[in-house]
């Protein structure tokens, strides 16, 4: 599967999560939602932001299962992937809010 097809399929699986975009960067694709970066696609791998402020690779077995043809997809695999992505996005969003709130607080001192 070529990179464009892979990214397209990942975005299709993420379609229940509105406003997810993929933007090409140096050597990888960056995943954003509402202007917040929460993931990366490098070659055929999806990496999501973790609690440790690092991008952790989603299990290759799960990625392989969500890339199956539609008539062979198990909805629980799509749901598991969406859960991981949503968790990563909320984590990234909370970090941005914390940084901006702290900056705003410091500017008002």
Stretches found by the model and what they are:
Residues 1-109:
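Charge-dense, helix-prone N-terminal extensions
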């Amino acid at each position: 599967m070529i990179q464009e097809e892979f990214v397209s399929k990942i975005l299709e699986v993420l379609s229940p999560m509105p406003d997810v975009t993929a933007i090409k960067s140096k050597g990888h694709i960056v995943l954003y939602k509402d202007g917040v970066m929460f993931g990366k696609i490098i070659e055929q791998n999806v990496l999501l932001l973790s609690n440790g402020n690092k991008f952790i690779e989603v299990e290759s077995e799960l990625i392989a299962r969500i890339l199956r043809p539609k008539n062979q997809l198990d909805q629980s695999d799509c749901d598991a992937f969406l859960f991981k992505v949503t968790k990563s996005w909320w984590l990234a969003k909370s970090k941005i809010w914390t940084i901006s709130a702290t900056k705003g607080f410091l500017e008002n001192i």
